[in-house]
Amino acid sequence: MARRYDSEAVRNRVLSTSVRLFLERGCHGTTMAAILKEADVSSSSFQNVFGNKDGVMYELMKLMFSGQFSAADSAAALLGPNASPAFAYAFETSVQLTIAELSEIIRDLYLQAYASERSLEYIRRNTAKHLQKFFQQYNPSFDEEDFYQMDIGTSGLMLGFMLRPCSDDFPLDVKIERYLQMSLSVLNVPAEERTTIIEGIKQQDLRSIAKAAVKQLFDVLSDTFDLELQAQIFGEEECDKEESAE
């Protein structure tokens, strides 16, 4: 019994330390040695609980993605009672792309999640269930495994668009529209409906929504790991600055 509690203490210390270091330095800038030193745990204790750094990333990734589809489930209401079920997916993925543009540290966290095979498999399996909910009517013969296979492709699209930062020649609104055109087309949403969905997404204040989502994530992390996290990662790293209306 003591061993179980010792493992739980190690898990909590490592995750708490990793959250803080990842947000301060990014995943690539955080070494295993730094995590072990600041968490005050031995290498053997760490390996017994997590195996390696990817094991830590997997646990944090589950927290990062846990609330995203709950927001997507309610997003369709933004277009009214006749909203397309695909709008919830478009909304969620648009917010995700926007979050990745708020800070290079956040982009790094997302990219690490997509780069880890274990984390990516978790994302694909969970996303496939939501794809089936949102897109079954467009693909009536598909089962969950079919949607899983589709998500192998759409998650590749997401990773590709996340890897390429915005620029003057490739602003965020263009990035989101390109992604939605491609992903919704792959999922067999009719062209006219794709246009309606994309126009609906353009009406949303995605930056404000994305910042609120990150703040909510920080609140969850703060409560879970008893940390004081402040969203100081929003700053000059943001691309596609909007011009002042005045």
Where are these regions (language model features)?
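The short coil/loop that forms the "turn" connecting the two helices of the helix-turn-helix
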Residues: 9-10, 41
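An amphipathic alpha-helix adjacent to DNA-recognition modules
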Residues: 11-16, 28, 48-73
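Helix-turn-helix
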Residues: 21-55, 59
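Hydrophobic alpha-helical connector segments
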Residues: 59, 70-106, 124-128
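Amphipathic alpha-helical packing segments from all-alpha helical-bundle domains
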Residues: 72, 112-163, 170, 174-181
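Short, hydrophobic secondary-structure boundary micro-motifs
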Residues: 107-112, 193-196
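C-terminal peripheral helix-coil segments that are non-catalytic and often amphipathic
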Residues: 136, 167-246
